[in-house]
């Protein structure tokens, strides 16, 4: 049976360092552990999940552009690009695919420069401060919204 929906998971700079990078803020799970868990959850929901992590803004933008005709929903942890990248915002708007912005830490309880996101006001939703569970909540929400609209 074919997958019902296609979800794209994008992770921005330094997310590849999860598990060892400031575990008090970002938790102890590695990115591979998070992606493996989410891939299993997606399979149980009968949806496909593609993943890209990049420290390069252009690579994330290129993958967003490639998603235009074959992805139903995007889950994105833009990491520091949330606070700096008009280009990622423009790419997301250009493809017109609904997306949920995810942050492991509560960005609103951190430094002032982390409290503004160029993506939040155009996102379908924002999840922050719930650690790795935020990815699961985003996936569940995306599938629920897609199921309701199809």
Swiss-Prot record:
The active site is at residues 26, 103. Transmembrane segments: none annotated. It catalyses: 3-dehydroquinate = 3-dehydroshikimate + H2O. Substrate binds at residues 77, 83, 90, 104-105, 114. SUPFAM superfamilies: Type II 3-dehydroquinate dehydratase. One of its GO terms (biological process) is quinate catabolic process. It is an enzyme of class 4 (lyase). One of its GO terms (molecular function) is 3-dehydroquinate dehydratase activity. Its EC number is 4.2.1.10. It holds the Pfam family DHquinase_II. The keyword Zinc does not apply. Catalyzes a trans-dehydration via an enolate intermediate. Homododecamer. This is 3-dehydroquinate dehydratase. It comes from Klebsiella pneumoniae (strain 342). The gene is aroQ.
């Amino acid at each position: 049976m074919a997958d019902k929906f296609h979800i794209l998971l994008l992770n921005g700079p330094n997310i590849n360092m999860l598990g060892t990078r400031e575990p008090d803020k970002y938790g102890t799970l590695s990115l591979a552990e998070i992606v493996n868990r989410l891939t299993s959850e997606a399979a149980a929901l009968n949806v496909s999940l593609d993943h890209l992590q990049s420290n390069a803004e252009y690579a994330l933008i290129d993958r967003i552009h490639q998603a235009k005709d074959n992805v139903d929903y995007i889950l994105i942890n833009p990491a520091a690009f949330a606070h700096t990248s008009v280009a990622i915002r423009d790419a997301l708007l250009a493809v017109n695919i609904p997306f949920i912005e995810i942050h492991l830490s509560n960005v609103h309880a951190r430094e002032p420069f982390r409290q503004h996101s160029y993506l939040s006001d155009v996102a379908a939703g924002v999840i922050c401060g719930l650690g790795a569970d935020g990815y699961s909540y985003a996936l569940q929400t995306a599938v629920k919204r897609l199921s309701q609209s199809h």
